[in-house]
Amino acid sequence: MNEIDFYKGINVSITICDNEGTVIYQNEKSAATFGDKTGQSMLPCHQQRSQEIIHRLLNEGDTNAYTIEKKGVRKMIYQTPWYNDGVIGGLIEFSIVLPETMPHYVRE
């Protein structure tokens, strides 16, 4: 069976780093947004506070989720560890553009 890159053409930016913070994968949307960062550290792309959060996520296995607005575009950022045989292998970051209006449903 051929391997399929399910993330290649989707409208979500996906960036994956190893446990040192080196980018090991970007889908097309991530590369178009940030440039090709494969093989480079993602830390210089972030402010000091964000670098500290990234280190905490890598060390403790926490997840960091928040929304931002930049140049009038709202995004949800979701950073979470990925694991290899139960050990943190690095982080995966999803950056999702949010519509101007988005319904919120409470379900029981």
Report each predicted region and the residues it spans.
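Sensory modules in modular signal-transduction proteins
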Residues: 1-25
